[in-house]
Regions:
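Short secondary-structure capping/turn segments at boundaries of alpha-helices and beta-strands
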Residues: 28-32, 47-50, 80-83, 96-100, ...
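Active-site-proximal, Lys/Arg-enriched surface segment
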Residues: 58-118
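Short N-terminal secondary-structure initiator segments
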Residues: 50-75, 236-250
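A structured, charge-rich N-terminal accessory region that forms the first stable segment of a protein
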Residues: 18, 22-66
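Single, function-defining residue in the core of a domain
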Residues: 1-38, 76-77, 89-92, 103-106, ...
Length: 337
């Protein structure tokens, strides 16, 4: 397959895998995924090319997923991906988000990806247990490892959702990077006109489809974070859509309110002409990582990660690496056509 020879040349050029046999074994599993296999041990074994019995293919995939040497070389492969995808980008938009693996929510994926053409290609990802979800220490260690992979000439804009808050923004600024995030829920901000702490939801009534610069505001009476805020009503009702619809679940009303809530965006970027529209476009690209998560987990249109029954974080990280390499090579083939 031409795709595998292209990936083999890329791996050899970057010299990220220390042994030829490990590289060959990895390429065969990536080829199995490209040939219609799913991100599960037995599915990859059945689709793996070769004339051996299926049980031997499954055992070969099992050995690859548990290979400690290849797992240690994993960050070198991600660093090569960063060098390739960010080679000509000085101010790339990089989206960071959490995602569950649908394994009883026992394991979660923390991913950094660059949006390209409606999808986001992973630059680096880690697997953590549920107890480390949104943990500041986990976030800090993730940023430090990711910072070592990003080329020195890049000063990215990190885009996150409302789950990432003050400690995360502080750690991003410590790396001399910029960030764009969303502020939501019952957070207080200091109103200089009234000299009082007010709920940020009191700003929602002034939201319009045009981005409005609120200014530099102090949030949280306890921590005193200073953010530059922008407000926009991103949701607009489509013409012809009925105003009242039946609620199909108890959470439908909650999701509808969350979807229609205005965007209160915070950023470290300086305010200048056109900054509001730039920040809104950057935050809109955050949804591209959600599409990537769907492609990863969908059993019909994607790689069916939901079929992976492993509860070992290292083996799951190896499955994610296989998926990233398959996505990367498909993207390269798409550029060539």
């Amino acid at each position: 397959m031409h795709a595998i020879s292209l990936l083999n040349s890329w791996l050899e050029r970057n010299a990220v895998i220390g042994h030829r046999s490990r590289q060959s074994a990895l390429l065969r599993v990536v080829e199995a995924l490209l040939d219609g296999g799913k991100l599960a041990l037995t599915q990859l074994g059945r689709a793996r090319p070769g004339n051996a019995f299926i049980k031997h293919h499954i055992k070969a995939v099992d050995r690859l997923l548990g290979n400690s040497h290849l797992h240690n070389e994993r960050r070198g492969i991600y660093a090569a991906l960063c060098a390739t995808l960010l080679a000509r980008a000085e101010r790339p938009i990089i989206v960071v988000d959490w995602c569950d693996c649908e394994l009883g929510r026992e394991l979660l994926i923390l991913k950094a990806a660059v949006p390209i053409g409606g999808r986001a290609i992973s630059l680096y990802e880690e697997v953590h247990p549920m107890r480390r979800y949104n943990n500041p220490r986990t976030h800090r260690q993730f940023l430090q490892r990711f910072h070592q992979m990003v080329p020195a000439h890049c000063h990215p804009i990190i885009v996150t959702d409302a789950g990432f808050r003050g400690p995360w923004f502080r750690d991003v600024e410590a790396l001399d990077w910029d960030w764009v995030g969303r502020v939501r829920n019952s957070i207080k901000y200091f109103q200089p006109e009234t000299q009082r702490w007010c709920d940020i939801r009191s700003l929602y009534r002034d939201a319009t489809p045009r981005v409005r610069h609120i200014g530099l505001r102090c949030l949280s009476p306890r921590h005193r974070y200073w953010y530059r805020l922008y407000l926009v009503r991103a949701y607009q009702r489509r013409p012809g859509r009925p105003r009242k619809r039946k609620l199909y679940s108890s959470n439908d009303g909650l999701y509808r309110r969350l979807h229609r809530a205005p965007w209160l965006l915070a950023t470290s970027l300086p305010h200048q002409r056109g900054a509001g529209a730039l920040i809104m476009r950057a935050y809109k690209r955050r949804m591209e990582i959600e599409e990537t998560f769907r492609d990863l987990k969908s059993h019909r249109w994607g790689f069916a990660l939901r079929y992976a029954q492993t509860k070992n974080s290292k083996r799951l990280e190896m499955l994610l690496l296989i998926a990233v390499l398959a996505t990367f090579i498909l993207w390269l083939l798409g550029l060539a056509t």
